[in-house]
Amino acid sequence: MKINIFGIIVFVFISIIIFKIYHESDMFQLKCIVSDVDGNKYCVRERNKLELVADLLANVTNNMKDLVEHLKITFPDRKNVQRLVDNFNPKKVYETLPTSSYTAYSENKGEKLAFCTTTTKEGNRLIDENTLTFVAIHELSHLATKTV
């Protein structure tokens, strides 16, 4: 009988740890959907405007792709442009979680680019594309530098 009770306690403990890890992960509150703009998958917060947010991220991603391509053609010998081209991955663009203290960030030089798409933390009003593109250009600059 002691083994059964011990086994149940271990099972419950492990289950709680697994749930806590999943709950605190980036993917807990994100739903990945395909944008109609470019056909790529974007992971966005679960809410009513899933398609609008995915399309906004797709438009900004297209703007980033155009900029990176333009820089690649215009300044092919510059090391910072080469780093930007190497580090930029348009398939790794996400929306930030509501728990994030950042409006935008890049992880590990391009493994992930995350953007807040609303005007306020709790708001439902989407930020305009030009403002988000401005923020995205700032994040791209982090990919082009050697340090943070």
Model-inferred region functions:
Residues 1-133, 143-148:
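Active-site-proximal or metal-binding-adjacent scaffold patches in catalytic folds
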Residues 136:
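A conserved beta-strand element that flanks and buttresses the S-adenosyl-L-methionine
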Residues 139:
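Walker B catalytic acidic pair
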